[in-house]
Regions:
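Pepsin/retropepsin-fold aspartyl endopeptidases
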Residues: 1-123
Length: 123
């Protein structure tokens, strides 16, 4: 956990990784640049349009890889170039994230946030 951001540690294909918890995100992402290192499974092309703080994202793919966190399995990630976010968070916190966990994903696994104290717990 970071004192600046809601960052948690999880596992992907047995490897430890860090994730930003983003209550404003409607979809979760895994960093396309780490596809080989983490064995991220690329599925079909995502047909929708993704627009985030950094602008429109192109070449977004469905990702058939799951994140394991606190004994729970988190599905439904997209594989995209999130290098701008990764660099920004690393500069701010010293932590390199692999991905972003969205609000619907948090809800799916019963993850709760206390924004004021930066505490995270599972139901």
């Amino acid at each position: 956990m970071s004192e600046e951001r809601l960052i948690v540690e999880g596992k992907v294909n047995g490897k430890d990784a860090y994730f930003l918890l983003d209550s404003g995100a409607s979809v979760g992402f895994l960093n396309k640049d780490k596809k080989k290192e983490y064995g991220l499974s690329e599925g079909r092309r995502f047909e929708g349009t993704i627009i985030g703080a950094g602008g429109e994202m192109r070449n977004v793919m469905h990702c058939d890889t799951f994140v394991h966190f606190g004994g729970k399995v988190i599905p439904q990630f997209l594989l995209a170039d999130i290098s701008g976010v990764v660099k920004s968070i690393k500069k701010e916190t010293g932590i390199e994230i692999l991905g972003i966990i969205s609000l619907p994903q948090m809800s799916m696994i019963g993850l709760n946030l206390d924004i004021n104290s930066l505490e995270v717990w599972l139901e």
